[in-house]
Curated annotation (Swiss-Prot):
Reported cofactor(s): FMN
Assembly behavior: Homodimer.
Catalytic activity entry: 2 a quinone + NADH + H(+) = 2 a 1,4-benzosemiquinone + NAD(+); N,N-dimethyl-1,4-phenylenediamine + anthranilate + 2 NAD(+) = 2-(4-dimethylaminophenyl)diazenylbenzoate + 2 NADH + 2 H(+)
Species this protein is from: Bacillus anthracis
Stated name of the protein: FMN-dependent NADH:quinone oxidoreductase 3
EC class: oxidoreductase
Cofactor: how and how many bound: Binds 1 FMN per subunit.
Protein family membership: Belongs to the azoreductase type 1 family.
Name of the encoding gene: azoR3
EC annotation from Swiss-Prot or TrEMBL: 1.6.5.-, 1.7.1.17
Binding residues annotated for FMN, in chain numbering: M102, W103, N104, F105
């Protein structure tokens, strides 16, 4: 049985978000096409996603010195435990669907924090004499991103940092097959917003058949 993580980073529901509407349409279609698979939703705005801070660095330092989990402070234990939960959940899944809005040329900061929970040496990648090698082979991802302007092509494509960063990090940890659905231009062309949404939903439903 394939396990799919539906990872969202939007405080709005599908009723108030173009991206979420497309994401939920994809998941609904995927479930219809693959009823035997397990889909787990991870709402990053309602999940404990520790940032790498002084507590985390201190905990890692203690581990490097050979100390155990019991040597950590309560705050360090809570953060390390949450990070490990996020990491283990991700590692044991087969497919990943990220749904994010673009905020100031990137995605919400909680997505960056989440990726920092995942890119852990010895777990999702390893160092070799030829450089780092990703360990999560045989998995695939989909990124659905909603943007008010057009960023998939044209002069602003170079500043689509969220899309590029997510693809880079996933590739670094071994997830080299990443599909992308752009839900874009709704603010630039408000008269076409509904048309843009419907086209993206149709694209998502079609992709669900082969994802």
């Amino acid at each position: 049985m394939t396990k799919v993580l539906f990872i969202t980073a939007n405080p709005n529901s599908a009723e108030g978000s173009f991206g979420m509407a497309v994401g939920e349409a994809f998941i609904e279609a995927y479930k219809n096409e693959h009823p035997q698979d397990e889909v787990v939703t991870i709402d990053l705005f309602n999940t404990t996603v520790p940032a790498i801070d002084a507590d985390v660095f201190a905990a890692w330092g203690k581990f490097a010195a050979g100390e155990g989990f019991e040597a950590l402070t309560e705050a360090q234990q809570q953060k390390v435990a949450a990070m490990n939960t996020n990491l283990e959940t991700f590692m044991h899944a087969d497919r990943y669907v990220f749904v994010t809005p673009m905020w100031n040329f990137s995605y919400p900061s909680v997505v960056k924090a989440y990726l920092d929970n995942l890119a852990i040496a010895g777990k999702t990648f390893k160092y070799t004499e030829n450089g780092p090698v990703g360990l999560l082979e045989g998995k695939k991802a989909l990124h659905i991103q909603a943007t008010g302007g057009v960023y998939s092509e044209g002069p602003y494509a170079a500043v689509d940092f969220g899309r590029n960063h997510l693809k880079t990090v996933l590739g670094f940890i071994g997830v080299n097959e990443t599909e992308y659905i752009a839900v874009e231009g709704m603010n630039a062309n408000p008269e076409k917003a509904q048309e843009i949404k419907e086209a993206a939903i149709a694209n998502a439903r079609e992709l669900a058949k082969r994802f």
